[in-house]
Structures are given as C-alpha cells and as structure tokens.
Amino acid sequence: MAEIRKLKNYINGEWVESKTDQYEDVVNPATKEVLCQVPISTKEDIDYAAQTAAEAFKTWSKVAVPRRARILFNFQQLLSQHKEELAHLITIENGKNTKEALGEVGRGIENVEFAAGAPSLMMGDSLASIATDVEAANYRYPIGVVGGIAPFNFPMMVPCWMFPMAIALGNTFILKPSERTPLLTEKLVELFEKAGLPKGVFNVVYGAHDVVNGILEHPEIKAISFVGSKPVGEYVYKKGSENLKRVQSLTGAKNHTIVLNDANLEDTVTNIVGAAFGSAGERCMACAVVTVEEGIADEFMAKLQEKVADIKIGNGLDDGVFLGPVIREDNKKRTLSYIEKGLEEGARLVCDGRENVSDDGYFVGPTIFDNVTTEMTIWKDEIFAPVLSVIRVKNLKEAIEIANKSEFANGACLFTSNSNAIRYFRENIDAGMLGINLGVPAPMAFFPFSGWKSSFFGTLHANGKDSVDFYTRKKVVTARYPAPDFN
C-alpha cells in the first residue's frame, strides 16, 4: 500500500511543514479513497505566515500597478491552459461532476480576469479647482495583509474572488482553504508561482479552529474575507471586528424560487432541477424552496418528479452523472436526519433521496418535499444538500411574504412572463441577488455578491467595485499652488 502524502503549508514561497502533529485525511467523497493528509496547523504557523506577508507587503505594495496586473494576466493564462486538470481535482476532492467542475474553473478564471484590470480599478479621482489655486485628488492604496477563509464547495471560484483581487491591488494574502479540498489549492499555488508571483505575497495555511482564530487575532492582518456557514461567519465577523479588522462575511442561504401560473413549465422545471440538485445542493445559491401558484402546482410537481427521475447519480468522473456525493459522512448523516425531520413534521415526501444511499460514497439522492409550511424545520434551516421544499401559494404576494420570513436573503428567483409581476417581485423581495426566469442568480465577477440579512455580515461585499473598496484605503491630497507670475 502506497504511503499517504502529507501536505505542507505554503509560506514565503516555500512548502513548509506545519508545527502541528495533527493531520486529517482528505477523502474522495464518491469512493472514500484517501487522497492525502492535510495538517491541522497552529497559531504559530499563522504567525510565521503573517510576519512573512507583512514583510513582503513593504515591497509588493510599491510594485507598479501594471506590473502587478501582468502577473495576474499570466496567472489567468495558465489557469486557462490547465482547465481540465483543475476540474479533475475539484471532482475527486469535492464530488462535482466534470461539467460542473469545468464551470467552476471558468468562473474562477473570470475573477482573475477582473483582477487583472487593476490599473483602471485602482484609479482615484480629482478636482482641479476646489478653491482659488487649490486642487484635490483621491488616491487608492492597499491596506496590508489580508486573510481569506474559504469553503469546500467552491474550492477554486471562491478563493479566486479573494486573493487575486487583493494581490492585484497591492496587498499580500494568507489563504486558509477548506481542509477538504487542498489538492486544488496546491495546483493554484503552482500556477501562480509560474506566473511570476514573488515570495511572501501569497501564503497558504491549512487548518481548523486555531488557524481561523489566528487570522482573526493577528495584529498584522488588517482585513478578512470569509465564506461559509452562518454560525462560523457570525463568529468571524464579531471577533474580527472586535480586533478592529475590516471584515466581510458571506454566510448561509435559503433561496426561494417563485413559479407563477404563466411560467413556461418546461424551462422552469429544467432550471429548478439544476439549481436545487446541481453540486449536490452544496452551494449558497442553490434553490432550496419553491413557492408555486396553486393553479399550476399539480402539473409543476408532475413534471418536476419526471425530470428528477432521469437524474443519474454517481462518481462525477463517470459519463452522464448529474448528481455526485455530498462532501463527507457527517453531511450525509445530517441530510438524512433532515429528511426524517420533514416526515415527522408532516411534509409529504415525493422523492426520497434515501433510496440512493450507498456505502461506496457519501451519496444522497434528490429529495423533494411537498406541502411544506414555514413552521417546519426543513423550511427554516439551511440544509446544504439535495433537498427541495415545495409550498403551494395563492399568488405572488403570498409567495414573497413567505420568502421574506426567512432569516436568509442571498438570492431569489421568479419564473413568469408577466412584466408587472417581475417589477413587483424586484421591488418587494428581500434578497440581494435576483433571477428572472433563471435558476441561479449568481452574478459575474464585476457585480457584487450581495447577500442580505443573515446571509451577509459586513458593509462591502465580495466581487465588483465593492471588492476594490474592501481591499483598498483612500488618501485625499489637497494642494495649493500659488498663482505664478509668468509675465
């Protein structure tokens, strides 16, 4: 039996062993094969990374912006050349099918492309005459060392909306990726090095609680970007803010999709199946609840069940597989417990994912509950799995009222051909990202990922102009130039 490789942290341009003696297995969720072991690093590791990044900031922040942008452009080119390899790593670590993994790689590359526009993004503004012989200019500067805490479900896309932009704008970065998906991170580091990355500018420390707390507490780290669950995100925001750091915390979701009587049912069902069960439901933009008007509900449910029956479940590397496993055994057990809870509380189970449970991997099949109410646990909680709740409503107003009761407000979608309904939905729904006749309203890199309510803690969102503001600070220079006498 081959020896299992133990991974190292990446600090100051080198792969270095952690100070820890604790390692966790990284497991392919479709096969339970142990891929490698990842260190559960210590605060001492974070301190080394932070000191290194702080030292590197002194020179990196002074590098000309076009030079920094060229390195990001080189990185984008290398990522594009290695798309298939990156997608393969996502599939074996995360469980997504190959098509989904390639899609994630594409979104990650888009984020790097956006960051490569740093010269224009860094530009400030000026006013030639604010008083007699007085002008003012507003300049952007990087803020220092930034910490990023990323989740398992998008191991490329989410880190790539963090560190490329922060680094392009002149900061240095410490990434704590998910301990479930380290091999993808290794490949990102390898390609970033080839792109011309200087030592100390980008650092990777694997770990769990100690690493998170080290990032939140270290005085050299000036800002923190987090993506993950609500309980952890709330903790990160509170503790980071207490330590006077700039924090953006993107957390949980319970996204609602509204289907009106005039919706194109074929397109609607196709979109909802993809949104609810793609990536095994493990994404913060997944469709978790459908509220459907009563006049079309029976037909909608029939078509939905018919579509779901065609879903192929299995290893994401296999041809034709749509639904892969959830990330680990704990997630599988948690999902099964929610199915039991839904039954206990009176929801009608019309597609039972327990029928697809297998000992070969962490599989749970597509699960659909009908006749769900807002008092039920399966409506309230973020399940983060291939479980969809359906609520029948009288009209759009009732559907919006139900969605607005949720503590989460990442995204919401509407399927209709009525322009008045679209406008009413846009103006009255409490959610930060809306989709009209599409299932996943995740924005492109140049728009903010703008969750509301308990889906986001902070002021400046990830992506778009918000990310530029988050990773920079401003300096306003006011200057008087006495009028010269050229006569």
UniProtKB/Swiss-Prot annotation:
The active site is at 284 (nucleophile). Belongs to the aldehyde dehydrogenase family. IolA subfamily. Changing residue 283 to L: At least 50-fold decrease of the second-order rate constant for the acylation step. Its EC number is 1.2.1.27. InterPro entries: Ald_DH/histidinol_DH (IPR016161), Ald_DH_C (IPR016163), Ald_DH_CS_CYS (IPR016160), Ald_DH_N (IPR016162), Aldehyde_DH_dom (IPR015590), MeMal-semiAld_DH (IPR010061), MSDH_GmP_bac (IPR023510). Catalyzes the oxidation of malonate semialdehyde (MSA) and methylmalonate semialdehyde (MMSA) into acetyl-CoA and propanoyl-CoA, respectively. Is involved in a myo-inositol catabolic pathway. Bicarbonate, and not CO2, is the end-product of the enzymatic reaction. Disruption phenotype: No effect on vanillin degradation. It catalyses: 3-oxopropanoate + NAD(+) + CoA + H2O = hydrogencarbonate + acetyl-CoA + NADH + H(+); 2-methyl-3-oxopropanoate + NAD(+) + CoA + H2O = propanoyl-CoA + hydrogencarbonate + NADH + H(+). HAMAP family: IolA (MF_01670). This is Malonate-semialdehyde dehydrogenase. It is an enzyme of class 1 (oxidoreductase). GO terms for biological process: inositol catabolic process; thymine catabolic process; valine catabolic process. Homotetramer. NAD(+) binds at residues 150, 152, 176, 179-180, 229, 251, 382. Changing residue 107 to L: At least 50-fold decrease of the second-order rate constant for the acylation step. Pfam families: Aldedh. Gene3D superfamilies: Aldehyde Dehydrogenase, Chain A, domain 1, Aldehyde Dehydrogenase, Chain A, domain 2. Keywords: NAD, Oxidoreductase. Disulfide bonds: none annotated. It comes from Bacillus subtilis (strain 168). GO terms for molecular function: malonate-semialdehyde dehydrogenase (acetylating) activity; methylmalonate-semialdehyde dehydrogenase (acylating, NAD) activity. Pathway: Polyol metabolism; myo-inositol degradation into acetyl-CoA; acetyl-CoA from myo-inositol: step 7/7.
